[in-house]
UniProtKB/Swiss-Prot annotation:
Induction: Expressed during exponential phase, decreases as cells enter stationary phase at pH 7.0. Expression is inhibited at pH 6.0. Part of the ackA-pta operon. It comes from Escherichia coli (strain K12). One of its GO terms (biological process) is acetate biosynthetic process. Disulfide bonds: none annotated. It is an enzyme of class 2 (transferase). This is Phosphate acetyltransferase. Gene3D superfamilies: 3.40.50.10950, HprK N-terminal domain-like, Isocitrate/Isopropylmalate dehydrogenase-like, P-loop containing nucleotide triphosphate hydrolases. Pathway: Metabolic intermediate biosynthesis; acetyl-CoA biosynthesis; acetyl-CoA from acetate: step 2/2. InterPro entries: DRTGG, P-Actrans_bac, P-loop_NTPase, P_AcTrfase, P_AcTrfase_dom1, P_AcTrfase_dom2, Phos_Acetyltrans/Butyryltrans, PTA_PTB. It is found in: Cytoplasm. Inhibited by NADH and ATP. Pyruvate and PEP act as activators of the acetyl phosphate forming reaction while inhibiting the formation of acetyl-CoA. Keywords: Acyltransferase, Cytoplasm, Transferase. Its main location: cytoplasm.
């Protein structure tokens, strides 16, 4: 039977959607089979528009289901005709029709607004009807812990008081947020106007909040400035602006708003990464200054021109190179004052199509939800947990945090690498050592609005390179290495980073955002060598499918492994899967299953399976298996009924590189899924390669993988 948790907001602007998304992510991390149930749609725009939480869950989660809520107009019609009983019956019917397979059902209540003053009484009725456990969601505002205590008590009393044993706890959102004079945490751009620093902030210790609360505090979520950074395109849409230069309008984030009414020298401090610069279109000096900043690497959020003046063609020509850097420029017909008023009404709630921000909100809020409470929701369930993609990513970061490793990044001045290093430092994933010119690295960081603080080290190759010449000569003397050649090779930061790893100055190396796979792997193979007991280096990809994570090997290194090599690849891959929380059930893949086929290719897989089983009888390995027999239970029953792996494989070993690489790319592209890797196996020390098209998140997770590998090799 499902556990039913109902999140009930105590007022407006509590951030209900953000809290719901965070709780969903916290449950997904634990592999909970979850369903989201919004009984009644309550779109912010009013009317019968799609419900925000339901739409976001459907668009962004492959493991959580969300039922279609009843339309508000229909509900209001039932209530006005005194048919509440009919409404409750429909809610129950909708609930049962859409939540049958869920372990936990998360119900999102209605927000009490001026238009929906019946919200709380209806929330109470729904909670009683579904026999749901109630969790209140509130924001702090200007309240002290004592005032919050009183507010929690009053809210509990309106839902039956202490006698209502279904009241489980409270989640306090926007803790220590800046508020206005009326105590409101305003969901509009006033939070990021340049004068927002004047806002009042209450510094409440979450521990004291727990002590004073009459209900268990199941989450205390600090307000975060980063979560309200909106895209430039969202502002352009809100203003119905004409786009002059699209640039990176879909990805650039606005973190501050500046009205450029002063002379240039008095505004330069505001020409920074993430700034929305608002100026009259007849101020070419501001436009040119912004373009100069962009050409110097400053990622200004966007430039908004007011007044409706046509841009001078000569100025437009002058700014072409700046526009090519990705600077978004858009224009409105209203004057600056009218534009200011329009910006004030911009709502900072996360748009349903802003997947990057949704992911950030989910991860951030989930980190502040009580883990013991989440664990307790399925404590009595006997079903084995699947490792979903969110659970896998969370596990990666947690294991990396515990490892506490130093990872060298030879491409230290590459923009994506710098961003990834900052994220790793912020999350405590690893200490990142950036190789490169310190001034250039700091310039790249500043241009992207990235702070390089604790958890990041910068090593100047020009300063340290000479100290590694002797060691390189010693390691490669049998290959005729001389000091002159060693100095030439050490001009390559990958070689330098590899020597740092070889001498235990760092714990792992990640490269490839700029370098080829060969350039990344060759120096470690020459200088680090294979691990004891390993005769070869292989690789795996972690394939983040909608409901679970698969391991594919080897799709990147060995072109045509022998049966002995294939057996070792299988064992290495199984151990890698287990190390990252995936129960290894290894399928040795071929074009035929069992004894149905013959030929050298099938015999190689059959022999590799036998060798792997002999070497590691503790592992669940079977083959030859066709891919469909390995993953589909119904096919497995007919093709391999006695196989312990068929129908539920988690590790897939391909017979050669051609098959493996083709399959990995076909699955990744056709299913539009995330893959992490290749992760190298069999090295004496961890080294990992990146795709040259790697995103920042790809680099972050590869750094985490590398840190975990280092911890496991000790």
């Amino acid at each position: 039977m499902s556990r039913i948790i109902m999140l009930i907001p105590t007022g407006t602007s509590v951030g209900l959607t953000s809290v719901s998304l965070g709780v969903i992510r916290a449950m997904e991390r634990k592999g909970v089979r979850l369903s989201v149930f919004k009984p009644i749609a309550q779109p912010r725009t009013g009317g019968d528009a799609p419900d925000q939480t339901t739409t976001i869950v459907r668009a962004n989660s492959s493991t959580t289901t969300a039922a279609e809520p009843l339309k508000m107009s229909y509900v209001e019609g039932l209530l006005s005709s005194n048919q509440k009983d009919v409404l409750m019956e429909e809610i129950v019917a909708n609930y049962h029709a859409n939540t049958k397979d869920a372990e936990v059902v998360l119900v999102e209540g209605l927000v009490p607004t001026r238009k929906h003053q019946f919200a709380q009484s209806l929330n109470y009725e729904i909670a009683k009807t579904l026999n749901a456990e109630i969790v209140f969601v509130m924001s702090q505002g200007t309240d002290t812990p004592e005032q919050l205590k009183e507010r929690i008590e009053l809210t509990r009393n309106s839902f039956g008081g202490a006698k209502n044993t279904n009241i489980t706890g409270v989640i306090v959102n926007k803790l220590n947020a800046p508020v206005d004079e009326q105590g409101r945490t305003r969901p509009d751009l006033s939070e990021i106007f340049d004068d927002s620093s004047k806002a009042k902030v209450n510094n409440v210790d979450p521990a004291k909040l727990q002590e004073s609360s009459p209900l268990p505090v199941l989450g205390a979520v600090p307000w975060s400035f980063d979560l309200i950074a909106t895209r430039a395109i969202d502002m352009a849409r809100h203003l119905n602006a004409t786009i002059i230069n699209e640039g990176d309008i879909n990805t650039r984030r606005v973190k501050s708003v500046t009205f450029c009414a002063r002379s240039i020298p008095h505004m330069l401090e505001h020409f920074r990464a993430g700034s929305l610069l608002v100026t009259s279109a007849d101020r070419p000096d501001v436009l040119v200054a912004a373009c100069l900043a962009a050409m110097n690497g400053v990622e200004i959020g966007a430039l908004l021109l007011t007044g409706g003046y046509e841009m001078d063609a000569r100025i437009s020509k002058l700014c072409e190179r700046a526009f090519a850097t990705g600077l978004p420029v858009f224009m409105v017909n209203t004057n600056t004052w009218q534009t200011s008023l329009s910006l004030q009404s911009f709502n900072l709630e996360v748009p349903v199509d802003d997947h990057e921000r949704i992911e950030k909100v989910q991860e951030y809020v989930a980190n502040y939800i009580n883990a013991d409470w989440i664990e307790s929701l399925t404590a009595t369930s006997e079903r084995s947990r699947r490792l979903s993609p969110p659970a896998f990513r969370y596990q990666l970061t947690e294991l990396a945090r515990k490892a506490g490793k130093r990872i060298v990044l030879p491409e230290g001045d590459e923009p994506r690498t710098v961003k990834a290093a900052a994220i790793c430092a912020e999350r405590g994933i690893a200490t990142c050592v950036l190789l490169g010119n310190p001034a250039e690295i700091n310039r790249v960081a500043a241009s992207q609005g990235v702070e390089l603080g604790a958890g990041i080290e910068i090593v100047d190759p020009e300063v340290v390179r000479e100290s590694y010449v002797g060691r390189l000569v010693e390691l490669r003397k049998n290959k005729g290495m001389t000091e002159t050649v060693a100095r030439e090779q050490l001009e390559d930061n990958v070689v330098l980073g590899t020597l740092m790893l070889e001498q235990d100055e760092v714990d792992g190396l990640v490269s490839g955002a700029v370098h080829t796979t060969a350039n990344t792997i060759r120096p470690p193979l020459q200088l680090i060598k294979t691990a004891p007991g390993s005769s070869l280096v292989s690789s795996v990809f972690f394939m983040l499918l909608p409901e679970q994570v698969y391991v594919y090997g080897d799709c990147a290194i060995n072109p045509d492994p022998t049966a002995e090599q294939l057996a070792e690849i299988a064992i290495q891959s199984a151990d890698s899967a287990a190390a990252f929380g995936i129960e290894p059930r290894v399928a040795m893949l071929s074009y035929s299953t069992g004894t149905s086929g013959a030929g050298s290719d099938v015999e190689k897989v059959r022999e590799a399976t036998r060798l792997a089983q002999e070497k590691r009888p503790d592992l669940m390995i079977d083959g030859p298996l066709q891919y469909d027999a390995a993953v589909m239970a119904d096919v497995a029953k007919s093709k391999a009924p006695n196989s312990p792996v068929a129908g539920r494989a988690t590790v897939f070993i391909f017979p050669d590189l051609n098959t493996g690489n083709t399959t990995y790319k076909a699955v990744q592209r056709s299913a539009d899924l995330i893959s992490i890797g290749p992760m190298l196996q069999g090295m004496r020390k961890p080294v990992n390669d990146l795709s040259r098209g790697a995103l920042v998140d790809d680099i972050v997770y590869t750094i985490a993988l590398t840190a975990i590998q280092s911890a496991q090799q000790q």
